[in-house]
Amino acid sequence: MSKAIVLDSHLKEKGSVELPKRYESINSHNLYLYVKHYLSSARANTAKSKNRAEVSGGGRKPWAQKGGGRARAGSITSPVFVGGGVSHGATNNRNYNLKINKKQKRLALEYALEEKAQANKLFVVEKIAIKGVVEDNKRKHLTKEANQMFQALEQRDTLFVCMNMDEYTELAFSNLKKCLIVDVSELNAYLLAAFSSVVMEEAAFQHVVQDKTEE
């Protein structure tokens, strides 16, 4: 059974907590489907080419129908001309969204957690809170404190997951390139797969791993 590593307030290992046994039997295909759904939903539908009705020009017949020895032509907007319209080109009314079931979303997230736990890259801490130092009625050194937390983990990049995240903690991590902090309500399988390590608050971890099969 896979386990998440429990860290103390100094981010040193002090124990472990088991993931639900049902996670072991989840198929990896659920994660593939969710990542495909996530990326397709984020795709901007901007590709657009003009057809022969949309290009400018073509108001008159380019040359006489007969007698010139050339193939007949009615308009320079025809796709056979350089600068003419495009046949079967891209349109900007295509919907790239791919449907995925609610159950598959949950299974994908659970599989991603299982993968992180097997790789010893899933960590649980009691609380993720950055308070900084109050100077002149302003909170300062927020990013410095957040960076110290990240450096103490000794990981390549890290996803931090909070339960009811406060504005100072969110602000503290916003300028760190190799970190991302999200509230548990925003957590998804794509984010779990995108980062090499994950640090979760204990409350957020319990919220995610609770049995939701009856919902």
Curated annotation (Swiss-Prot):
GO molecular function: rRNA binding; structural constituent of ribosome
InterPro entries associated with the record: Ribosomal_uL4, Ribosomal_uL4-like, Ribosomal_uL4_dom_sf
GO cellular component: ribonucleoprotein complex; ribosome
Residue ranges of the region described as Disordered: 46-72
Keyword entries, A-Z: Ribonucleoprotein, Ribosomal protein, RNA-binding, rRNA-binding
Compositionally biased residues, Gly residues: 56-71
GO BP: translation
SUPFAM superfamilies to which the protein is assigned, alphabetical: Ribosomal protein L4 (SSF52166)
Function: One of the primary rRNA binding proteins, this protein initially binds near the 5'-end of the 23S rRNA. It is important during the early stages of 50S assembly. It makes multiple contacts with different domains of the 23S rRNA in the assembled 50S subunit and ribosome.
Protein name, UniProt field: Large ribosomal subunit protein uL4
